Amino acid sequence: MPAKAVCVLRGDVSGTVFFDQQDEKSPVVVSGEVQGLTKGKHGFHVHEFGDNTNGCTSAGAHFNPEKQDHGGPSSAVRHVGDLGNIEAIEDSGVTKVSIQDSQISLHGPNSIIGRTLVVHADPDDLGLGGHELSKTTGNAGGRIACGVIGLAKI
């Protein structure tokens, strides 16, 4: 059954991100735009809670129902919510989001509906950086924008 979701990002930067899944076994297509990022890569993750009462910090850790180490989108071992990086080509411009991911879902136990999408200040090292935070957060820095992922009309 097809499903769609949307997330409106708010914070120091802003944007709108859409999620489309044709059926429960299909990958999720993530698309949209983020405005106001500094030039370079920025960690892009689904966090465990849809709680933004204390800004982005109340969203909890990365969505990780399998209790794995942090990794990149193509890593064999990763959090479900590890979507890697989005890259701003220029300061404060529009950054296009175009990702296809088979770990997140809009159905079942790996559903991201009601969870928070977070854009981070720094690049995600995909768990390979050797920093003490590499295996938990990708050492991606502060949370500069976030929003709750909600169901959208098909």
Curated annotation (Swiss-Prot):
Residue positions binding Zn(2+): 62, 70, 79, 82
Molecular functions per Gene Ontology: copper ion binding; identical protein binding; superoxide dismutase activity; zinc ion binding
Cofactor list: Cu cation; Zn(2+)
GO cellular component: cytoplasm
Broad class of where this protein is predominantly found: cytoplasm
EC code: 1.15.1.1
Compartmental location: Cytoplasm
Pfam families: Sod_Cu
Disulphide bridges: 56-146
Residues binding Cu cation: 45, 47, 62, 120
InterPro entries: SOD-like_Cu/Zn_dom_sf, SOD_Cu/Zn_/chaperone, SOD_Cu/Zn_BS, SOD_Cu_Zn_dom
UniProt keyword Zinc, yes or no: yes
Keywords carried by this UniProt record: Antioxidant, Copper, Cytoplasm, Disulfide bond, Metal-binding, Oxidoreductase, Zinc
Catalytic activity annotation: 2 superoxide + 2 H(+) = H2O2 + O2
Assembly and oligomerization: Homodimer.
PANTHER family listed in its UniProt record: SUPEROXIDE DISMUTASE CU-ZN -RELATED (PTHR10003)
Free-text function comment from the UniProt entry: Destroys radicals which are normally produced within the cells and which are toxic to biological systems.
Protein name: Superoxide dismutase [Cu-Zn]
Organism listed in the record: Bombyx mori (Silk moth)
